[in-house]
């Protein structure tokens, strides 16, 4: 900035004054938002004196920076109070330029000057004020004033939660300024109040819609509703003469002059209170057309006189829809909107529905034909519900016949075998399905008694032999079975036990119970098999009835190689099966005591085939061919025992099922229907039995029962030693064909060389087939 070349005092004075004004205007001062801060500003007067005045900056902006925009703050101190007489400073002409230089330096350092690139001066903050012992009294709302507008809205609008740190959610709450998820919750009281408000508003709208608003220019009245001017406040109307209706509706809800309601949805913005002035939510004042009740009529409020009467012609009564009525028998009914109406009520009088006018007057009202909903109509008569029968009593319908279920052969399936390997507590017994049939053994007695008899799937037998015959056999009689005492066994055929008997010593433990020797009163010895009923559970009675019916049929079989059944008896806890007594025991006991040669094995095999041929021809399947179930008498005659009992799975204990597994055919284990137990299954068991007699060991003797089960299922044959004769090996392998259709029948096997070899001669001349050492 150039200095003026003019040396006159007047020009120098004017120049200094202008420079001083610019310097002061570029100076800065600081204020606090909570208190007023003032400072001394130099007021220069040239050429006389330099004085100072105090300037108040209480009107400063919140930013804390005050920039004087005019030079009015620099005033000449001509008055006596602005001068400082004791501190006057004389300014010479030589020192004036020094002052100007200082002012210019100050102007260059000012941060508010344009084009200045120097760093701004340090800002005065509250910490400096405390150091300088300046008293500072912060107000209660000082913290809120310091927050700028930019801090009201966080600059971060999205957050990512990785789930690694446990404090991520807490930091988000802290960032947005809440303490936790509870700050977002709505209190139950506020929610209930809001719901009550919405419910009351919707009820009012429903009531207004139910009225015929088109026939009249208003609805029900009785309160105050504010409407229809945008520029006026609400005005309340006293409608105490309207009665106890309690509802006021404005008809001109739009800003037009028409009194009709053009938009019922505008009612959602109103809150109607009985007898009080109500303001709508939008704050818009409207002038309603109000209807009031006067002597039973709804009329305009302007037509009601001082005494409550109606001016001019009485208007017609509004037609309120029937849907708003609640009809109560014998009294006046109020509609839902609170308006009293006198409906036509029908009451029941002497069986007729008539008008409730205090009785039937004049012409009797027509009777309504109501359908007798409390009656039940039957083809042969009318039955009145819960009031007894009037008229002809209907006939009782005959129940439909019992549905016959297809017979199912459940015992011996692979599932039953697997479950029997489990402990006793884990075994789940299967219920047997049954259907009705008749007993062919005693048809005349069944016809006389007319008792329905049942056929159980467990007792169904399907066979296939040389004649391809198949038949089913009955079991028990349904409800006609009677309890037999110990002294009166069931008589089924000749040779049965008809007198009392006594149990003797134990002979052996059979597959289905213990076998004892017994004697009758006539001195006849026989064997009795004792089966415990306690082991059969809740289905013991059904199981025993099935077994009794089966034994009744087996008792009719007569063959030298078949063990004869002689009847049954039972008491409270046991079932007794009477059998033919065989003293020498089973083949299992025999080959354990003696060494049996091939010739004797061939003889026993021929007798077994004779017995199987007879059973298959009669329609029976043994199901349990093995050495333990084949008995030998004192003459060396082989007898098949325990046949037929294996069909009743309830009588099979766990031990017998494990032992029977080693002789089972693969189709029996893998079967899915009744085709598993057919005559070829007995042929497979016969081959295992011959192998057992030849080796003195049961088949699959080196395997556990479960492992043997899977071996048989996969079709793995038992080991046949090479030490056996060729005929014996060929006979065994012929019986152990995996395909049941490839196995020969019992009749065909009787022609095999293994069973047709000649019998050895006996030195004693005995005709017994048993060869003694």
Swiss-Prot record:
Q: What's the reported outcome of changing residue 667 to K?
A: In summ1-5; suppression of impaired plant defense responses in mkk1 mkk2, mekk1 and mpk4 mutants
Per the UniProt entry, the effect of residue 644 to E is:
In summ1-8; suppression of impaired plant defense responses in mkk1 mkk2, mekk1 and mpk4 mutants
Regulatory region: region residues: 100-493
Q: What class of enzyme is it?
A: transferase
Consequence the record notes for mutating residue 527 to T:
No obvious abnormal phenotype
In this chain, ATP is annotated as bound at 507-515, 529
Where is it made, tissue-wise?
Answer: Expressed at least in rosette leaves (at protein level).
Keywords from UniProt, A to Z, are:
ATP-binding, Immunity, Innate immunity, Kinase, Nucleotide-binding, Phosphoprotein, Plant defense, Serine/threonine-protein kinase, Transferase
What's this chain's function? Triggers SUMM2-mediated immune responses, including cell death and defense responses. Probably inhibited by the MEKK1-MKK1/ MKK2-MPK4 kinase cascade to adjust plant defense. Seems to contribute in transducing external glutamate (L-Glu) signal that elicits large-scale changes in root architecture.
Q: Name the protein family.
A: Belongs to the protein kinase superfamily. STE Ser/Thr protein kinase family. MAP kinase kinase kinase subfamily.
Q: What protein name does the entry list?
A: Mitogen-activated protein kinase kinase kinase 9
Name the gene.
MEKK2
């Amino acid at each position: 900035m150039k200095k003026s070349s003019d040396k006159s005092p007047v020009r120098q004075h004017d120049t200094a004054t202008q420079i001083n004004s610019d310097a002061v205007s570029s100076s800065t001062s600081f204020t606090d938002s909570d208190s007023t801060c003032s400072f001394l500003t130099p007021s220069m007067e040239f050429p006389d004196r330099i004085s100072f005045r105090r300037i108040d900056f209480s009107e400063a902006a919140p930013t804390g920076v005050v920039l004087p925009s005019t030079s009015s703050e620099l005033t000449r101190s001509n008055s006596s109070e602005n001068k400082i007489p004791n501190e006057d400073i004389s300014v010479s002409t030589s020192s004036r330029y020094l002052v100007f230089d200082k002012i210019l330096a100050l102007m260059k350092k000012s941060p508010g000057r344009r084009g200045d690139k120097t760093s701004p001066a340090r800002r005065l903050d509250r910490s400096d004020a405390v150091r300088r012992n300046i008293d500072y009294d912060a107000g209660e709302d000082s913290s809120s004033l310091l927050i700028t507008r930019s801090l009201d809205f966080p600059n971060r609008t999205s957050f990512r939660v990785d789930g690694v740190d446990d404090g991520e959610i807490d930091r988000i709450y802290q960032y947005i300024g809440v303490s936790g998820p509870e700050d977002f919750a709505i209190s139950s009281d506020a929610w209930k109040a809001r719901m009550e408000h919405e419910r009351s508003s919707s009820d009012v709208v429903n009531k207004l819609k139910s009225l015929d608003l088109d026939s009249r220019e208003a609805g029900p009245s009785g309160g105050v509703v504010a409407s229809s001017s945008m520029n006026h406040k609400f005005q309340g109307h006293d409608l105490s003469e309207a009665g106890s209706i309690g509802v006021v509706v404005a008809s001109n809800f739009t800003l037009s002059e028409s009194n009709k309601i053009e938009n019922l949805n505008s009612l959602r913005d109103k809150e109607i209170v009985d007898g009080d002035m109500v303001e709508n939510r939008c704050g818009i004042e409207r002038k309603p057309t109000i209807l009031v009740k006067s002597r039973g009529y709804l009329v305009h409020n302007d037509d009601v006189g001082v005494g409550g009467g109606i001016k001019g012609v009485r208007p017609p009564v509004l037609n309120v829809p029937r849907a708003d009525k609640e009809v109560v028998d014998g009294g006046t009914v109020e509609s839902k909107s609170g308006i009293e109406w006198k409906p036509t009520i029908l009451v029941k009088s002497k069986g007729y529905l008539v008008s409730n006018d205090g009785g039937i007057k004049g012409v009797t009202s027509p009777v309504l034909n109501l359908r007798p909903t409390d009656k039940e109509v039957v083809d042969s008569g009318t039955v009145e519900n819960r009031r007894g029968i009037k008229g002809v009593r209907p006939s009782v319908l005959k129940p439909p016949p019992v549905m016959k279920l297809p017979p199912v052969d459940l015992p011996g399936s692979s599932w039953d075998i697997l479950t029997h390997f489990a402990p006793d507590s884990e075994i789940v017994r299967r219920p047997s399905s049954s259907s009705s049939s008749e007993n062919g053994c005693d048809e005349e007695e069944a016809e006389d008694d007319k008792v329905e008899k049942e056929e159980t799937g467990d007792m169904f037998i399907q066979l296939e032999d040389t004649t391809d015959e198949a038949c089913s056999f009955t079991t028990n009689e349904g409800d006609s079975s009677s309890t037999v005492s110990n002294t009166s066994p069931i008589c089924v055929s000749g040779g049965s036990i008809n007198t009392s008997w006594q149990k003797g010593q134990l002979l052996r433990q059979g597959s289905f119970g213990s076998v004892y020797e017994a004697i009758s009163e006539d001195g006849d010895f026989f064997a009795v098999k004792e089966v415990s009923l306690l082991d059969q559970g809740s289905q013991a009675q059904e199981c025993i009835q099935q077994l009794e019916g089966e034994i009744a049929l087996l008792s009719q079989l007569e063959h030298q190689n078949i063990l004869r059944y002689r009847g049954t008896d039972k008491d409270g806890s046991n079932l007794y099966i009477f059998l033919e007594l065989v003293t020498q025991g089973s083949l299992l006991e025999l080959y354990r005591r003696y060494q049996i040669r091939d010739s004797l094995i061939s003889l026993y095999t021929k007798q077994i085939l004779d017995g199987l041929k007879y059973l298959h021809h009669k329609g029976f399947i043994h199901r349990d061919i093995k050495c333990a179930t084949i008995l030998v008498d004192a003459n060396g005659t082989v007898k098949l025992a325990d046949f037929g009992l294996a069909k009743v799975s309830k009588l099979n204990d766990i031990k017998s099922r494990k032992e029977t597994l080693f002789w089972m055919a693969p189709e029996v284990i893998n079967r899915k229907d009744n085709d598993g137990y057919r005559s070829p299954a007995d042929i497979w068991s016969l081959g295992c039995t011959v192998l057992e007699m030849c080796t003195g060991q049961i088949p699959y003797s080196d395997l556990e029962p479960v492992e043997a089960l899977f071996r048989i299922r996969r079709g793995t044959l038992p080991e046949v030693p090479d030490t056996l004769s060729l005929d014996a090996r060929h006979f065994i392998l012929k019986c152990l064909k995996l395909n049941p259709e490839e196995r020969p029948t019992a009749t065909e096997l009787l022609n095999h060389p293994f069973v047709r070899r000649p019998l050895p001669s006996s030195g004693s001349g005995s005709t017994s087939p048993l060869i003694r050492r």
